[in-house]
Amino acid sequence: AYRIASLVAGGTIPCVFSRGNHDLRGACAENLSDYMPNESGRSYYDFRVGCIWGILIDCGEDKRDDCDEYGHTVCCEPFRRRQTEYIRQKIADSAHSYAAPGVDYRLVISHVPFTHNITESDAFGHHPFNIEIERYTEWARLLGEYVHPQLMFCGHMHELTISLPGSSYDDKGQPCPVLVGSKPEKRPDGTQYFIGMAVTLNPGAAEVCFTDSEGKTLHRETLKI
């Protein structure tokens, strides 16, 4: 992670890393915290960069802990439970976090867009990704009622979406617009390229731009925040 940050930003731009669900898989997954920024070994934390305050939320895996795919190697439910308490702690200490002097923008970063209505089913007609509905709804409520974030940044879905509160994606009460900006694509010759997202924050507005790895802008939209 540190090498990626160095190659991308050259030490001139602050970088924030959000662990994804695939990072929990593999022989070295339990050692990942040795190779990426964290807070006391935790992959969820809050940060302050100038006038920006943000909180990273880590949903862990995207299916139940007892899913056969994991072979009994993950234990994400208690991990998410601790994050509920962490969010409550930040609310109780708001004067030193999102309500601190000089904070103009409040962001939520989560690889998994936990407020999304994910209806994808498996071969048996089950919905393995539709998990933790009560907990994720509680996270959304706490963030919306107390933190009042302006934007949530996500990936995971391999798509490009701007979901406003109350949209067809929102079934848990989004606290703010949710931006999903991470999509791998293939060229006609089979080689891959990537589409990402850039967001420019201005007083009262955010410019969202989806741009591919070849420098082409696919979509640009300004949101009121």
Where would I find each of the regions flagged by the language model?
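Active-site glycine-centered loops adjacent to acidic/histidine catalytic or metal-binding residues
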Residues: G20-N21, H111, G155-H156
